[in-house]
Amino acid sequence: MEVKVENIRAIDMLKARVKNRVARSKCFKNASLILIGITTLSIALNIYLIINYTIQKTSSESEHHTSSPPTESNKEASTISTDNPDINPNSQHPTQQSTENPTLNPAASVSPSETEPASTPDTTNRLSSVDRSTAQPSESRTKTKPTVHTRNNPSTASSTQSPPRATTKAIRRATTFRMSSTGKRPTTTSVQSDSSTTTQNHEETGSANPQASVSTMQN
């Protein structure tokens, strides 16, 4: 009977150990499950954070690209201009020219007055001689014009002399016509008076023309 009791106790001890192991195993299982869940959650969080980081990075890069090209082009242009200063010298030094111009303008305003020679009697005499030389041709021209008129005076005199001849001829013809029609001798008084008037007019015109020519020569 004692052997049976000992066997029963041994069996109970084995059962207790098995239960403990099972309990321990269950705890391990639960612990392992908890650990697995925690790891999965951490992995999910890590994945979420990585995705958000990539999205933010792409958006920031796109914004940077949209804003950066003008600045980069300006930088490139500035580097090109510094590398090649002979391309646009006026564009590179506008401020220098603007600052130098005020200093140059007073010098330019002062230089003409300083460089101009003072007027001397010699220069005034030269100017007066030049004015006289320029005035003499005009006077000579004015003098030559009356000579042309004096040359034309004989023609005018001839033209003035021609009408009296025509008038005397007409008067003679009229007298001959009267003689033939009346058969009487015409009175010569009218003819002589007409011819005398014409000759007087001719003398007056001839005397007036030389006086006009002399007055023009004197002028």
From Swiss-Prot:
Q: Which residues lie on this side of the membrane: Virion surface?
A: 52-219
Supply one GO BP term: symbiont entry into host cell
List the Pfam families.
Metaviral_G
UniProt keyword Protease present: no
Q: Name one GO cellular component term.
A: membrane
Positions of glycan attachment: 52
Identify the stretch(es) annotated as Disordered: 58-219
Predominant subcellular localization, coarse grouping = host cell
Subcellular location(s): the record lists: Host membrane; Virion
Q: How does it sit in the membrane?
A: Single-pass type I membrane protein
Composition bias, kind Low complexity: at what positions? 165-178, 187-199
Which spans does this entry mark as compositional bias, Polar residues?
76-142, 149-164, 206-219
Q: Which InterPro entries match?
A: Metaviral_G_glycop
Q: What is the stated purpose of this protein?
A: Attaches the virion to the host cell membrane by interacting with glycosaminoglycans, initiating the infection. Unlike other paramyxovirus attachment proteins, lacks both neuraminidase and hemagglutinating activities. In addition to its role in attachment, glycoprotein G interacts with host RIGI and inhibits RIGI-mediated signaling pathway in order to prevent the establishment of the antiviral state.
Q: What is this protein called?
A: Major surface glycoprotein G
Source gene? Answer: G
